[in-house]
């Protein structure tokens, strides 16, 4: 039906006869000559309809509406110099049409304009309700093309590194120690349920036991969890696993993979190896295990300096085993008012969202003098003040913000304020496409964290991460040493966002059982839930490890978008709904009966 794509035509095609198909982006009538901007997925080109080419052709063109689907034949010619459009790649040429056929008409009114000439914002709800129209817009076309380029580059790289692409099951079993599963009832096995995979974790480990050695998959994953801008109930992972590789070898190969993607998509040569931070160092310096290193304001622990000054908020936190930490805002005296820091202010509100009950602050004046509340100023001696200013690197005109309490809350508070103030003070362009790509690895995570609600340890990543061998010690000390051991786990962070992560895996069945016992799974339950894995580990499992990247998030960053919904063809809302198909939806009583399910939910009419 067509000989060329609209956006691929150039001056070299002048005098060529072409057949084009696409949508009418807009139509203009100028003094008896009709101009049509014809659009397909590659771009737009100007079509000229001259009445000299025939009255029937002209009549059809006169009645065209935007988004009508057409086929046009004609000859490419140069535009007059005064009418060239340098903003378009096809702006130096046009097609003089000699044939126009309407392939499909528009019925009714469009819910929003799709034209490349219309930049008026459209509500996301409307875009998602009519996603098939939104996909025609240049923004979405570019994002999906970019997504394709990322996948193509990743596949090519992994093929060259001798990886096999292997699919793992979508219908699997529900296992503990993860997010909430999406469950699927079995009609054949009455009363039993499948779960949709949260990741291919156990299957890719079994592939390593099976001797595949190097595996990858563009994996669909499902998690029934509360959503935000960078989360979806179903999402895509670039999933990788390999045998007989050390942690450093895995990180090195991953850096080459990421570098190949950035080079292909952005033309950027990334410098690697990427910096490494231990988990503890990241928490100490940034208050988070996903640090953004494009700006300063690093956390400083000033507990030792301030523990004896007589300010109950500080001393009480320290005496209770917590800490006092702070961040320094360069030039903050001029940039931030007291009103913003006190109750009711936006900075105070951000701190409250992280769990803080209050904020303290010091303004640094000339000659090392400070302004602060009396309870701090009156009890801070000269030596303490000098040491505080030295440790915080604070100078005249700077503002120091303090948080006190349990260390976890203090870290969350200052990490949140650090990110909020970086955006508020425009320390970095927050459109995320500023070409500043600060990659880093966070390594040496704790194996476990304490779940106070359930009064037990739980795996910080998952219970299949291998512990650091130097922390583990001899076999008889495993149960004693495991709770405080570090995991051989690693996360890749870019500009404050986690791109993905992984670990070396446990390949010793006894150690795996001990880890499951540590998180509170009795022997019989462990064998019931993970017996297939434990049995496989007894059959000569090789040392192995891997990682997974969130494809949607990578594309979001590369595209300069603020939500992964703009990188997915048919995303869900933050309520996990598809506005286009109105899923999820009720099913018939007959379907429920076949599945042996009775609903107890009473729907409000």
Swiss-Prot record:
The protein's matches in PROSITE patterns, at most eight in alphabetical order, are given as:
AA_TRNA_LIGASE_II
Q: Which family does it belong to?
A: Belongs to the class-II aminoacyl-tRNA synthetase family. Type 1 subfamily.
Q: Which GO terms describe its cellular component?
A: cytoplasm
The name this protein goes by in its record: Aspartate--tRNA(Asp/Asn) ligase
The subunit field of the Swiss-Prot or TrEMBL record says: Homodimer.
Report if keyword Nucleotidyltransferase is assigned: no
Give the UniProt subcellular location, in the record's own words: Cytoplasm
| Family annotation (InterPro entries) | Aa-tRNA-synt_II, aa-tRNA-synth_II, aa-tRNA-synth_II/BPL/LPL, Asp-tRNA-ligase_1, Asp-tRNA-ligase_1_N, Asp/Asn-tRNA-synth_IIb, AspRS_core, GAD-like_sf
